[in-house]
Amino acid sequence: MANVAVYNMEGKEVDKIELNDSIFGVEINEHLVHMAVLQQLANKRQGTQKAKTRSEVRGGGRKPWRQKGTGHARQGSTRSPQWTGGGVVFAPTPRDYSFKLNKKEKRAALKSALTSRVVENKFVVVDELKLDEIKTKKFVEVLKNLNVEKALVVLNDMDEKVIASAANIPTVKTTQTNELNVFDVLKYDTVVVTKAAVATIEEVYA
């Protein structure tokens, strides 16, 4: 099992904990991680794009001029794609881009993502994250003490003061253990997680 330091909000090491290898020490499956990220991005797509083909554009039923003798190139309709106001070739239509990964694959992908952060020393454990008031400046100070900037902050419980304090920091996202996902883990440079959240993750995914 990997030993990692536990820091307080001042950035001082106060403890060490062992991480469960079945979650934080697995063999990294890059293909599954890739598929999990693709799934999240695909499921976000609206898929509402639409353009009209030549058969859907209004008008253009009459041949604009006779086939021969005008000196013009032959044309069958003013709604052909080469005409202004004509239809679109292979026009996009609404579609559903989403696809599914089974539960086992999702869990394996998340474990791989978490393991990669531990291996890269981008997994920071804090004993707790508590603020007396909603104060962005104070939260920035905590991050500075921990030597992190672009971070995913994983909380065990909904802490409104911490969440509100981090809301205006564009390089930080707060989440809870039940909302943890591969995309967020990889998007942010560092995962900052409370000691209680680590225990919950190990309880759920072990």
From Swiss-Prot:
User: Is RNA-binding there in the keyword field?
Assistant: yes
Provide the GO biological process annotations.
Answer: translation
**UniProt keyword Thylakoid present:** no
Q: Name one GO cellular component term.
A: ribosome
Provide the alphabetized UniProt keywords. Ribonucleoprotein, Ribosomal protein, RNA-binding, rRNA-binding
Matching entries from InterPro entries are given as:
Ribosomal_uL4, Ribosomal_uL4-like, Ribosomal_uL4_dom_sf
Q: Where is this region: Disordered?
A: 44-87
Bias class Basic residues marks the residues at 60-71
GO molecular function list: rRNA binding; structural constituent of ribosome
Which protein family is it in?
Answer: Belongs to the universal ribosomal protein uL4 family.
Q: How does it assemble?
A: Part of the 50S ribosomal subunit.
Q: Which HAMAP family match?
A: Ribosomal_uL4_B (MF_01328_B)
Quote the PANTHER family the UniProt record gives.
Answer: 50S RIBOSOMAL PROTEIN L4, LARGE RIBOSOMAL SUBUNIT PROTEIN UL4M
What NCBIfam families does this protein map onto?
rplD_bact
Q: What does this protein do?
A: One of the primary rRNA binding proteins, this protein initially binds near the 5'-end of the 23S rRNA. It is important during the early stages of 50S assembly. It makes multiple contacts with different domains of the 23S rRNA in the assembled 50S subunit and ribosome. Forms part of the polypeptide exit tunnel.
Name this polypeptide is given:
Large ribosomal subunit protein uL4
Q: Which organism is it from?
A: Agathobacter rectalis (strain ATCC 33656 / DSM 3377 / JCM 17463 / KCTC 5835 / VPI 0990) (Eubacterium rectale)
